């Protein structure tokens, strides 16, 4: 079992095990990734790996922040929005293809570091969710759509599904890139 799994496994461990699993797969998928590969777009309307990696980090950071009921995030309070030169309001959801194409000139290592910082905040956030808290919503911080604020249970399920899919996207794009060179 991963080191962050609880001593007496419960509902949180499903999410913890899942994020550990896709995290290992993600690290494998980006190992040795060149900046040319990271910014390559299979079609003019496709996301590139670097943007997807950033979005994975933003999702872990945003959902960890939501699980905590607000407060500190790596993106804003931790200064990562400024450091990476991306508008603090963005998380990738709803980004236009022009925003993807015009993603800042960043190194893979910088974006990976942001993801890892966000993940280090996410794990304790998941661990603090008791069974009694699963139906809690935070409309007070979900200001763009307070009437659609998700339950903490929904967040625990959504996070590994979405980021597992994005990890698969990265591996797939990497495979497409290498096949175009053959």
Language-model segments: residues:
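Short, contiguous alpha-helical
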Residues: 2-5, 16-30, 35-94, 137-182
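Active-site rim elements
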Residues: 4-17, 105-112
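Alpha-helix initiation/capping motif
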Residues: 9-10, 74-77, 83, 107, ...
């Amino acid at each position: 079992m991963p080191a962050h799994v609880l001593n007496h496994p419960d509902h949180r461990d499903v999410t913890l095990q899942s994020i550990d699993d896709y995290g290992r797969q993600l690290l494998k998928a980006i190992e040795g990734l060149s900046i040319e590969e990271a910014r390559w777009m299979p079609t003019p309307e496709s996301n590139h790996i670097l943007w997807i990696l950033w979005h994975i980090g933003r999702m872990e950071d945003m959902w960890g922040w939501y699980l905590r009921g607000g407060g500190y995030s790596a993106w804003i309070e931790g200064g990562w929005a400024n450091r990476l030169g991306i508008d603090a309001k963005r998380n990738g959801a709803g980004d236009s293809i022009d925003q993807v194409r015009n993603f800042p000139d960043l190194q893979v290592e910088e974006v990976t570091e942001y993801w890892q910082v966000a993940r280090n905040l996410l794990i304790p956030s998941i661990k603090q969710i008791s069974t009694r808290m699963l139906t809690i919503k935070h409309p007070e911080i979900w200001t763009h759509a307070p009437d659609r604020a998700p339950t903490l249970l929904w967040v625990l399920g959504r996070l590994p599904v979405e980021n597992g899919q994005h990890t698969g996207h990265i591996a797939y794009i990497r495979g497409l890139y290498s096949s175009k060179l053959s």
